[in-house]
Amino acid sequence: MSGIKYTKTHEWIIVTDETNWIATMGIAERVQLIHGDIVFIEMAVIGDEFEAEEIIGQINVVSGETIPIHIPVTGEVIEINELIEENVDVINHSPEGDGWILKIAFESSVEFESLMDQDDYNMYEEDSDLDPEYLDDDEYDE
């Protein structure tokens, strides 16, 4: 397992500790390109457990929209990024770096490997052609 992976709902995940099955996740820069800066984030707490694709939180963007955050793999939240709790603007400047959202302990490499790699995600983005409807609320229905 290596490299960053992406979901169709624009979350990213990377395995940061293969021995203990720990991954770091966040939202893709794509979300900001379409919706603008993030002004508020609400997320799960340490110890919460989720199935893959469940909603673990939400972001509010400058336009007033609320966008759900989905967990890419089944797992337990083990760490929250304190930087974004103190200053959500960190996500705006580095959504796929210092603006990571949380770390999860997970068990299924199958779920991880089934996600899109960088090339597949880039093709997925190109197919959407930066269409604002591309991230409408219907895409996030459970």
Regions found by a protein language model. Give the residues of each.
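Short, charged beta-turn/beta-strand-edge "cap" motif at the junction between a beta-strand
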Residues: 55-57, 62-64, 84, 108
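Acidic, low-complexity mobile loops and tails
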Residues: 1-52, 93-120, 124-142
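Mid-chain, well-packed structural core segment of small domains
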Residues: 63-98
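Conserved hydrophobic positions within beta-strands
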Residues: 10-13, 59, 69, 77
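Nucleotide phosphate-binding site architecture
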Residues: 57, 78, 122
